[in-house]
């Protein structure tokens, strides 16, 4: 097995089981999010227009969770060893993602207010930190010369996301539109396919 021979071997709890559990939790989170989506209050174009902010918030939240599901899938598919630290880091990520429906519901009612807008960024920032912690735990369990270790030798996009989320939280006090624009920009940035795992597999 690759990795440092002096490092204690982690308990192999099965990446497949961890991925299946995480998929189920994320599916529940998306279901809760969808149940909170509100229909227009009337049959007119104006009623539909009035509902556009809530629709934007729903789409942003849905894409946010979908991005994490996609990256989580590729991350665990490149993982061969799962340690206890990986399990806990994964639970922390799921906890942060479970807060998305809460802040989304708050934004539905108060999308013009700075605090709810900043709260979305805080949850997004916490999720980004927890995903980074999960990546580090997986690399420690598998070794830096493993597929996942080579694929994520650097994480410029992840670090940039942290900076942008923090900027969005700070800007929410002065302009909620600017904060939403930053959150949306991060989502668009992550919609671009990540080729790191493919490149890492090619170097094996």
Region annotations inferred by a language model:
Residues 2-204:
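Multi-pass alpha-helical transmembrane bundle typical of ion/small-solute transporters
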């Amino acid at each position: 097995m690759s990795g440092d021979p002096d490092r204690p071997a982690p308990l192999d709890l099965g990446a497949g089981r961890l991925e299946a559990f995480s998929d189920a939790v994320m599916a529940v989170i998306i279901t809760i999010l969808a149940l909170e989506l509100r229909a227009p209050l009337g049959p007119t174009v104006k009623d539909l227009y009035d509902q556009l902010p809530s629709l934007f918030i729903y789409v942003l939240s849905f894409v946010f969770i979908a991005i994490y599901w996609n990256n989580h899938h590729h991350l665990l598919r490149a993982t061969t060893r799962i340690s206890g630290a990986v399990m806990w880091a994964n639970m922390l990520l799921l906890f942060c993602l479970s807060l998305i429906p809460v802040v989304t519901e708050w934004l539905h009612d108060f999308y013009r207010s700075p605090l709810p807008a900043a709260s979305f960024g805080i949850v997004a920032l916490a999720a980004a930190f927890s995903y980074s912690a999960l990546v580090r735990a997986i690399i420690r369990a598998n070794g830096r010369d493993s597929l996942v270790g080579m694929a994520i030798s650097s994480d410029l996009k992840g670090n940039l996301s942290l900076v942008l989320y923090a900027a969005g939280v700070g800007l929410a006090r002065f302009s909620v539109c600017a904060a939403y624009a930053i959150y949306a920009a991060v989502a668009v940035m992550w919609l671009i396919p990540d080729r790191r795992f493919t490149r890492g597999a090619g170097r094996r």
